[in-house]
A protein has these predicted regions:
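Terminal amphipathic alpha-helical/low-complexity segments used for targeting or macromolecular assembly
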Residues: 585-698
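AMP-binding/adenylate-forming catalytic domain of the ANL superfamily
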Residues: 98, 421, 427-436, 459-481, ...
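AMP-dependent adenylate-forming
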Residues: 1-7, 16-18, 117-142, 172, ...
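Glycine-rich loop motifs involved in handling phospho/adenylate chemistry
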Residues: 37-41, 69-77, 96-103, 198, ...
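Phosphopantetheine carrier-protein modules
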Residues: 30-40, 62-67, 386, 390-395, ...
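AMP-binding/adenylate-forming domain of the ANL superfamily
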Residues: 1-153, 167, 174, 275-279, ...
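Phosphopantetheine-attachment site and its flanking helix in carrier
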Residues: 76-87, 404-408, 514, 521, ...
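Motif- and composition-driven signal specific to adenylation
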Residues: 78-80, 91-106, 137-336, 341-349, ...
């Protein structure tokens, strides 16, 4: 009987990401590739822009096999032009989130040895490995090969420094093609689909978002960073932007009403454990919901399971091309149903930039007969249907979908002035949030707020913990720190800030401040102890800020996540809320689905709109026939009147005619429509939709 966990022999045919992009552009040249809400690039236009950037990179000395840094604001078209341009130049892109500290960018680009860095407005500057004497005339176009790297993504490292993981084109393209065999087999993804891009490009799951669109001719729709931070406000955005494909973390999906996903037909979850209620609530006959699993070291996703709402929530079976095994401490397979460490092999195995670490982590597994394998550190069991995630076997954790090595946080804490001992741990709050807490033993003059600022200057926000000062750090009999025994709630999140050991505030608050403090206590694990407490110093992040806003909107409907970032101090936030309009007791507005009659009308309207393109092609054919009759004696060719061809050229090909015809069509369709509010899916909505499509086609 074939082992369902061994699928390396089913790996897709070798090719590169450049091969995939060009094949899609050839098949769907006029389909939208990127729509950022302000501009739309077709696949032809994306390829042209990327080739222009690739040429500029070659002129600046970038050659095939080099690495190029990317640091461009999220949600912009330039970000994706940069990524595709670097790939077309034959180089690998090395992303750093635009919001990360400059020190993080310096470390990442230095460790990667980038030859150039592409920044805002696609400005290119030299990197640490630049070739200033390179001859632009020798910059021949050279496509990447299968063994060349496509991207290098840095993850949290146990030594205190981030680790660079290099993914080759063979790895990446195999992942993209293997996923095409998993999702939506009955109704494959295609040019009509719109894929949300909401993840930071420094997070490897962003690669899944991009290629879920670009593998099939669908449109990538970047979500504004402000909406991603707010969480709940992404729901209406999904509806307004006709999003049909979403890949995200369960924590974010939990903030959206089910109606916000009415048009979503594929929902992919990953990055953290998926609660059972997510699948039960969101899986429908018209929507596939998948729970996926995979470390960066094995190219984004190694396995997945379609959720049907029934427990247990599995991480499923491997992608075609990946091998999985569950082993004991001696590296031998365990019986089905028994827990063990998950080992990954196959075509998706990436590599570390550090050769020593690569050799240690991607080691042979003699007990499996594998020459190279990745030890995940995750404990799973195979229940006969698929793999079930059990937890971690080491000090690596996931918070908000981001993988974190507690050792890296420990090292950063120990580097703070006045700290003599440190240990990071993840604790769960009353609201179910996982909170990263840094416990330190320190001198009497230790300033936690200054320490937090120092950490923010050198680390991504997700790695900056809530700081709690303790007298001693508990240890096991082995002498190692016992992270499980670290106190929660903490005895003091910071000096003069935080809660007592009982979790009660050490300063009485009243009015709006007391009401906010109650929500802070549920979301962050303990209440603030003073009016000058800072939400983010107590461990708040983007997702917990979104949760706080959802609570505050019960009284103050106009509050946004931006208000939390602008007024993180308790007293300041309370004053801001008091200055807002009188509380109204707002409830979340339901997102109405488009009526089926309107959907049918849109399908019929699409046929009419597409016929305009067909007439344009017929005009070109007619023009070709007329020219052929003039230059070739071919009586067998069909004849056509000059008048019809001239009319078609004036209205459907000539730019001035197309503009006039588009304007006239829009005015005719929208005749009588004035400013105002109209129901979603109503006649005015349909007329606006048709006018927009007519103008786009013309």
């Amino acid at each position: 009987m074939t082992d369902p966990l061994l699928r390396a022999h089913l790996a897709p045919e070798p090719r590169t990401l450049v091969d995939i992009l060009r094949a899609t552009a050839d098949a769907h040249p006029d389909s939208p590739a990127i729509d950022n809400g302000r501009e739309v690039l077709t696949y032809d236009e994306l390829l042209d822009a990327a080739q222009e950037l690739a040429a500029a990179l070659r002129s600046d000395g970038v050659r095939r096999g080099d690495r190029v840094g990317v640091r461009i604001p999220s949600g912009t078209t330039d970000l994706y032009v940069a990524i595709t341009g670097i790939l077309l130049a034959g180089a690998a892109y090395v992303p750093v989130d635009h919001d990360d500290p400059d020190e993080r960018a310096r470390v990442v680009f230095g460790e990667a040895g980038v030859a150039a860095i592409v920044g805002t407005d696609l400005v290119i500057r030299s990197g640490p490995a630049a070739r200033p004497d390179a001859d632009p005339d020798e910059a021949a176009e050279e496509d990447p090969e299968l063994t060349d790297d496509a991207w290098v993504i840095f993850t949290s490292g146990s030594t205190g420094l981030p680790k660079g993981v290099a993914v080759s084109h063979r790895n990446a393209a195999a992942f993209v093609d293997a996923e095409s065999r998993m999702f939506l087999q009955q109704r494959p993804i295609g040019p009509g689909d719109r894929v949300m891009a909401g993840l930071s490009v420094a997070f490897d799951a962003s690669c899944e978002e991009m290629w879920l669109a670009w593998r099939y001719g669908a449109c990538l729709v970047p979500a504004p960073r402000s909406l991603v931070r707010s969480g709940m406000d992404l729901g209406p955005w999904l509806v307004a932007n006709d999003i049909t494909i979403v890949s995200t973390v369960p924590t974010l999906v939990a903030l959206w009403p089910a109606d916000a996903l009415a048009d979503v037909r594929l929902l992919i979850l990953g990055g953290e454990a998926c609660p059972p209620e997510i699948g039960a609530r969101l899986a429908t006959d018209t929507r596939e919901v998948w729970n996926t699993y995979g470390p960066t070291e094995a190219t984004v996703v190694a396995c997945g399971a379609q959720l049907d709402g029934q427990p247990p929530v599995r991480i499923g079976l491997p992608l075609d091309g990946w091998d999985l095994a569950v082993v004991d401490a001696q590296g031998q397979r365990v019986p089905d149903g028994e827990p063990g460490e998950l080992i990954i092999g196959g075509v998706g195995l990436a590599r570390y930039l550090d050769p020593e670490k690569d050799a240690a982590v991607y080691a042979p597994m003699p007990g499996l007969g594998w020459e190279r394998a990745y030890r995940s550190g995750d404990v799973v069991r195979f229940d006969g249907v698929g793999l079930v995630f059990q937890g971690r076997a080491d000090d690596q954790v996931k918070v908000g979908g981001r993988r974190i090595e507690l050792g890296e946080v420990d090292s950063a804490l120990l580097g703070l002035p006045g700290v003599s001992g440190a240990a990071a741990a993840v604790k769960r709050t009353e609201a179910g949030n996982r909170l990263l807490v840094g416990y330190v033993t320190a001198d009497a003059g230790f300033d936690p707020k200054a320490a937090a600022e120092q950490l923010r200057a050198s680390m991504p926000a997700a790695l900056v913990p809530r700081i709690a000062v303790v007298d001693t750090l508990p240890t096991r009999t082995s002498g190692k720190i016992d992270r499980d025994a670290l106190p929660w709630p903490p005895p003091g999140a910071s000096r003069g800030t935080g809660a007592t050991a009982s979790g009660t505030p050490d300063l009485e608050l009243d009015g709006t401040a007391a009401w906010i403090a109650g929500h802070w206590a549920a979301i962050l694990g303990s209440p603030p102890s003073a009016p000058d407490e800072d939400f983010f110093d107590l461990g708040g992040g983007s997702l917990s800020a979104a949760q706080l806003v959802s609570k505050l909107r019960e009284r103050h409907p106009d509050v946004t996540v931006a208000d939390i970032y602008e007024h993180p101090v308790l007293a300041d936030l309370a004053q801001t809320l008091d200055a807002m309009a009188a509380p109204t007791g707002r409830t979340n507005a339901a997102v109405s689905p488009v009526p089926r009659d309107t959907q049918v009308a849109q399908v019929l309207g699409t046929v009419v709109v597409r016929s305009i393109g067909a007439l344009r092609w017929l005009t070109w054919i007619g023009l070709g026939l007329l020219v052929a009759h003039r230059v070739v004696d071919a009586p067998w060719l069909p004849s056509i009147a000059w008048g019809w061809v001239l009319a078609g050229w004036l209205l459907l090909i000539n730019p001035f005619g197309r503009v006039l015809l588009g304007a006239a069509a829009a005015r005719l369709v929208l005749r009588g429509v004035g400013p105002g509010r109209y129901p979603r899916g109503g006649r005015v909505h349909l007329r606006l939709w048709l006018a927009e499509r007519l103008v786009d086609e013309l």
